[in-house]
Amino acid sequence: MKGQEMSLELGLIGNGKIAALIDSRAEVVWCCMPRFDADPVFCSLLAGADRDLAGGFSVSLVDASSFEQSYLPNTPIIVTRVSNDRGDEIEITDFCPRFERSGKLYAPPILARQVKRTTGNPLVQVSLRVSEDYGCSHREAVVHKHAVDFPGKYPLTLKSSGQPLSMDVPHPVTASHTMSFVFGGRDAVADAPPFEQLLEETLAYWHVWSAALKLPGDFVDAVTRAAITLELNAYPETGGIIAAITTSIPEAPNTGRNWDYRYCWPRDAYFVVNALGRLGDVRTSARYLHFLLRVAEAGGSSLLVPMYSVDGGPIPEEQTADCLAGFRGMGPVRIGNKASVQAQNDIYGEAILTAEPLFRARRGEEVGEDPVSARAGDRTLFTRLEQFGEHAARLYDQPDAGLWELRGTTRVHTFSSMMCWAACDRLASYAEAVGLAERARYWSERAIAMHEVISKRCWNPKKKAFTAAMEGESLDASLLLIPRLRFVPATDERFVQTVDAIERELKHGDFIYRYVEQDDFGHPENAFLVCTFWYIEALAAIGGTRRAEALALFNRVLAARNKHGLLAEDLDTRTLEQWGNYPQTYCMSGIIDCALTLAGQAIV
């Protein structure tokens, strides 16, 4: 809308194949088709002051003055109620279809919208601008009576039901009819069932999915919303899990810290499948692990890279989309991510820890359709994971860019070293679980030797803390994960002292910064939100009076979510405004982990 500054007060709809962001006035401001990392068809989110010229899909009530928006409970279906001062009111329902159809998951690349009259005699105007080439051009529209075609490399269609469709012309919406729209790939739209069936079956699907979650006694709504959001970032065709559906929303204003997160990071995915696994969803772990093993073995060397496209292929070389001004005009808008070519040694640990829910599951229990071996952890899966363990044992004391993906320097990061240790430690437990005593001894001996080196070289006796790197002086927030990795227990004096040091150096108000030292882009300005969730987990694990602190802080952090219960990557600690790519799976995983930990469930 002209004159309205873009914010992250946005709702998310999706189905795992695509996703879209909808603003408070029911305009679709971001959507890529036919998959998460494709060219955006709607991109006014990143168009700056030119958002009215960028791609978007709006359904507007003439003379609208009031807007109310919320999710239907336990679903990713958004309802927006719009009214004006004359007493006219409409209800707009937005979703992406997802349900079982002919024994398979039906999640087509389409958006579904419906407009209903609730009171008065509303006039509604539909506006659809389809972007191409990252905002450099628009698709030409070919208008038919009940459809609009948008030819191109990936042909798109808008199909309407009800009265004949005229774009940008006010339509009356009467009590006797509704306006329904299905927009997306031409073939997908042609194959779609009637709108009411799409809505009813999608609603039923998510009610069943949500009911299967093993929820804590408290924070039920927050955890359910977080779990649904994570599931929307899991690509069902391959099992890949993206970090966020957006690119280039700045971590802080005018910093240039604008990154493309529409890809699959083994690190981020570990946190996602771990959180969902704690809620009882083991299938997502199995599908993702199959994805990871497939991409590793496809290269012939079992080496992993920091990120993949949703189909398991390489991501594009980083470039800028110069036709888009950026979020609030704060470019650049990036496509691809240079961090994909970095050394990030922790990824082998995360790959192995991802399998932990499978080895905890009952032997022989079906956990997925893909041949991982499609069963809970067994000897075949264990043997395939050992290749990652060998890389971890080789790399644990080697320099890398670390989990913060520093672009200008490498060092032996403590988190990477400990994650490599965790890889060997877990392989020992997996081997024991499947009755391979010799392999259990092998991996246990490697883990013990690594633990001794890391304990000596990553502990700074003068600082009385584990440090960010071997023989280092500085801190970073990943050290809060030490008990989760089981390197030392939360009650170990070294960890307690490390938390004390982090509070002194990295805590600003309620929030934890990932680090405070200068990097390639200067000093970090906003808090990286997941670090605060790690801090809450650490306090809860330490116990005693710190547990009450953790609970109080968790409630305050939850209050920083937007009205939809969603969080971006970063937060301005003074204004509590969200920044960074949105919604971010790291943060939504953090909500689940903290709620379960505070409910007494062990960190896994």
Which stretches of residues belong to each language-model region?
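Acidic, mature catalytic/reactive cores of soluble proteins
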Residues: 1-604
